[in-house]
Amino acid sequence: ANKKVEGSTPFARSKENFMSDLSEKKCIPCEGGIPSFDINEIHKYLKKVDGWDVKQDESKNFYLIKEFKFENFINSQKFINKVGNIAETEGHHPDIWFGWGYAKIKIFTHAIKGLAESDFILAAKIDKIPNA
């Protein structure tokens, strides 16, 4: 009844399943008092989101950033409206720039001036938007 698939284990997960675990979590509001992720934690979580880059600002604080491409202005606008709806639902608000054919999203936790799990949760939820 139980067939063993070559090269798999009961704990093997596809990247999609690994990401969906994160996208199904809820952002937890941060009022400070917790440390921001260190570079090892950042790299662990970065594997769970698709195409996001980690950068540092002038104060050496880490943030996530990703640019999305679209065919025209209206599709960019529709996308950022969906991002805005997710942000409001989650209570976690990214910085957003958009124009003809693109939208750029920057995510970090303001209260700790760095990255926390909620930032990666929001990134995973944004990645689930159709045509993102």
Language-model segments: residues:
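Short, Lys/Arg-enriched N-terminal segments with co-localized hydrophobic residues
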Residues: 10-18
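Long, contiguous binding/interaction regions
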Residues: 19-74, 81-132
